[in-house]
Structures are given as C-alpha cells and as structure tokens.
Amino acid sequence: FPFLMEERRVCRVLLLGPPGCGKTTVLRDAAKRLAGDGIRVSVCDEREELFPEDAAQAGLDVMRGIDKPTAIQMLLRAMSPQAIFCDEIGDMRDVRALLDAARCGVGLAASAHAGVFDDVLHRPVLRALYEAGAFERYLLLGRHGKLAAAYDAEGKPISGGGIEHEKRRGDGHDFAQRDRLCSGGRRNAPRPLGAGHAPNPDADKRHDSL
C-alpha cells in the first residue's frame, strides 16, 4: 500500500475514484494489513460496507451504523487509535470530524467519488478538506482498483509506488488551469493543520452525496 506509511507513521490519505473502482476493497485490505503489523486501527463504518463481517479477528475496532462525527469522537476517546479508517465522506459535519482527528495526530484514510483530482476543487466538501490541509496525500484509483495517480497535499503529482500513469483529463499537470477553477481566478493553498483555518459550515448545507 504505497504512500500510506511514512517511517511507521500512518499518513492522512484520501482515496479517490469513480464508483465501482474498488475504493472500499482497498481501504478494507489496507486496514487489515496495518492491524496485522501491530498498528492500532479503528474503523468508522457508517454505511456498514467496509466491514460487514466480524472484524475482531483482524484486530480492528469497528463502529458500524453510527454517523462519522459521533463515531470518530468515541474512537478517539476510547480506543487511542494510531489510524482511523472511514467510509465515504458525506457533508461538512464529516469534514469537521476528520479535521478534529487530524489535529489529534491520528492517521486517516477515507474515500470519495472523483474521476480526476480536479474534482476535489469543484466539490465544496472536498475542497474544504483540501484547503484545511486535512490530507497529506490523494490517491486516485483507475481500472480494477489500480493506482492511477498520487498527489501531495498541494495537489502536485507524486511518482513511484506502481502508478499506472494513465493519461487522463485533469490529471494534475496543468496547474495554471487548476488555479482558474476556484472563484476569483485563484484557489486557497492548503494550510498546515492548526493554522487557524476552519471550514465554513454554510459552504454546503445540503448533503453532498459522494
């Protein structure tokens, strides 16, 4: 699982990809692998899709059917996780919960529907996470769950890790075009966590079904 670990520390990673590309499977396998390596992994499985079966044998602490804000707070207080895995990000309440976890120094792994990295900047919920510096890495899945591209916290491509290097629209190489995607002709650069930046809870009052 390239780009997920850095010197025994679990990074904050957002897994991107179209529906049906295998995001859930990749998250499930990664959580099991980390737990097998002795890392304390907790799972927020709101939709009961990540671990519908008993996860105790995998050494995971799983909370099923509970909304992410509630589950993440309970996991942080009770389980002392080194990493929290959760299913697809939904709305601004999820954003705030993930930022709380990130500021506690916990590794994160979550997923969201996106065909290309630039979709992150077009969707208010994902853009709020990007601008707040919630994730250190963005991993884009291609066909059959293969890693098609990887980006750092600023959206710059990362090489290595078995990336397929598929040539796709908006693959992150036209930074001038990406800068124009945001209102006013420019985007807000990601800020380090703790820099005083908070997402606007009114940015997306509707549920952004990912």
State each model region's role:
Residues 6-8, 34-36, 54-55, 75-79, ...:
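Conserved catalytic network of the ASCE P-loop NTPase/AAA+ motor domain
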Residues 16-19, 61-65, 86-88:
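Glycine- and other small-residue-rich loops at beta-strand/loop junctions that grip anionic moieties
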Residues 174, 179, 200-204, 208:
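Intrinsic-disorder-associated, low-complexity terminal segments enriched in Asp/Asn/His/Tyr and depleted
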